[in-house]
């Protein structure tokens, strides 16, 4: 699926099996995973690289010292996300952030580290903690710096319409280091949500 944005586009896709990914990978993509010993990490990287290739066939990737991907010889910005069985890539003209998550993940275990009482009061939906986590992950990726505190440096201040997993789309307003940032949330299917900066 492709979601157009004012600054570019966000694509999301299921992660294919390892054999399909490796047989379809370019030599450069295979070199990029040569030192990765974890099979799941290799698959995740090959999956998002394949999705990026479908969005921008000539895109070349390099990695910053913190491991964040960057497009070589391009002014475009990239953000990537993956969960166990799904991958997302945001590609655009300005810094961006994207996060995809499975809804069966237990977000309540760590909610006290990222979900403030005022944020919790914004929505009563059972998946609201997942939405806030995704939004803050997307904001973190957009920020592109170390030492960001998910409570101090970013806040979700509004959601419209109220989160409704039947309707499947909503608009979020956040503050990142005091600056307003808009995000979109999307229910991909019964098991996944996607949030990206606008």
Language-model segments: residues:
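Core catalytic alpha/beta fold that binds nucleotide/phospho-ligands
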Residues: 1-198
């Amino acid at each position: 699926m492709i979601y157009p944005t004012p600054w570019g586009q966000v694509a999301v896709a299921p992660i294919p099996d390892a054999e399909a990914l490796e047989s379809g990978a370019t030599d450069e993509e295979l070199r990029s995973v040569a030192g990765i010993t974890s099979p799941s990490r290799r698959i995740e990287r090959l999956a998002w690289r394949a999705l990026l290739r479908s969005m921008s066939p000539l895109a070349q990737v390099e990695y910053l010292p913190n491991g964040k991907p960057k497009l070589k010889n391009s002014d475009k910005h990239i953000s990537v996300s993956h969960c166990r069985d799904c991958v997302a890539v945001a590609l655009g003209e300005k810094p961006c952030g994207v996060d995809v998550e499975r809804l069966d993940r237990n977000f309540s275990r760590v909610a006290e580290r990222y979900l403030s009482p005022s944020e919790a009061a914004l929505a009563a939906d059972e998946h609201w903690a997942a939405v806030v986590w995704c939004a803050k992950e997307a904001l973190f990726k957009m920020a592109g710096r170390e030492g960001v505190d998910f409570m101090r440096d970013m806040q979700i201040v509004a959601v419209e319409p109220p989160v409704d997993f039947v309707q499947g789309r909503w608009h979020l307003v956040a503050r990142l280091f005091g600056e307003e940032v808009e995000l979109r949330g999307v229910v991909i299917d019964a098991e996944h949500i996607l949030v990206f900066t606008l």
